[in-house]
């Protein structure tokens, strides 16, 4: 223990050292006050409260990089939405989006991620997430679908998803889509500096239950920016005042997956990716990447 304490003292930055964030500024002019503020917080281990590691905090250059990736990502989602119509295959949408992203000098992050075979995820009706585009999956009137796209531009990642529908959809589907978007926005509003990640999930779950819907707990949001998936895991069903501390410079996704029926899901045994509601009920999801700021948060990708 004594050796560990001594190492921490030795490794502690001095005021005139370069800041750990990579900004090139002196520590005293950059993150010294930030670290002192976090040091003063008394974390409660019984609530799983932890401080965020420095490696997930973005500096100004990182934030600009994420924003540039987000411009392409937003354009890709716009294109995908324009293509949604009865008679088109989900593979056609995938291929068009792939070409769009590549033509802008970026890379579709989903492609080959842990073996995922396509460039985007398209999840229809009872598919919760990770639906694999296929030439055999043809959109028809009454379908609802989530299109999830992540773009990597020069090593910076922007992740977002939107809901779309084809023709006339059921009242249940309309309500699910609308309420799920509201749930995402409530979660984003709860993401405040020097509060905890659990506040997001508590807010999301409260609104979902009030509308008779359930929150998928097996999957959630994540840190995103300098890599596709970073800490922390962002649950959309948990207790407030728990988990990792949210601090300025963190970028995370808020992406509640909401089922019209029960929360249980199952993963396709054949493709290993497609996640469906276990009871066959409809599912919806909206997602934005946000930045925690000194005064609240800022949407980076939507």
Per-range role (PLM):
Residues 10-16, 23-302:
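Active-site neighborhoods and metal-handling regions in enzymes and metal-associated proteins
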Residues 2-6:
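N-terminal cationic and glycine-rich segments that engage phosphates or anionic surfaces
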